Amino acid sequence: MAKSIPKIGSRKTGRIGSRKHPRKIPKGVIYIQASFNNTIVTVTDVRGRVISWSSAGSCGFKGTRRGTPFAAQTAAGNAIQTVVEQGMQRAEVRIKGPGLGRDAALRAIYRSGILLKVIRDVTPLPHNGCRAPKKRRV
């Protein structure tokens, strides 16, 4: 009986040509998504390919602590650390959401030494779109 030839990139053979090897990335875009419950920081190159990401939940914060400014600062630091090692020097920051971690994550990015070209707020605002949910009564 003939042996079957394993497919390239199948689960058994592992990934061939993966993008995990470090690349030189001088410029990039940092996305901060800050909700009331969590903060997610994603770093991409100029073309939009994700280089690294981190969230308050992936940094070990659970429950309501994920929405704190300290958790956002830790998440931003973790996401930026791998990118600085790959040689990123300049970045554009896009912040989305009303959360408490907006400023803390931005401060952590400042401290990393990356030059920020533009800081843009891309929070979606409705122009009187859908009806808002009813107010909570506690």
From Swiss-Prot:
Listed Gene3D superfamilies: Ribosomal protein S11
Region: Disordered, residue numbers: 1-21
Subcellular location: Plastid, Chloroplast
Keywords: Chloroplast, Plastid, Ribonucleoprotein, Ribosomal protein, RNA-binding, rRNA-binding
Cleaved signal peptide residues: none
Single Gene Ontology BP annotation: translation
Gene Ontology CC: chloroplast; ribonucleoprotein complex; ribosome
InterPro entries linked: Ribosomal_uS11, Ribosomal_uS11_bac-type, Ribosomal_uS11_CS, Ribosomal_uS11_sf
Domain of life of the source: Eukaryota
Compositional bias (Basic residues): 9-21
Any one GO molecular function term: structural constituent of ribosome
Assembly: Part of the 30S ribosomal subunit.
Similarity field: Belongs to the universal ribosomal protein uS11 family.
Name assigned to this protein: Small ribosomal subunit protein uS11c
Organism, as annotated: Pisum sativum
Protein encoded by which gene: rps11
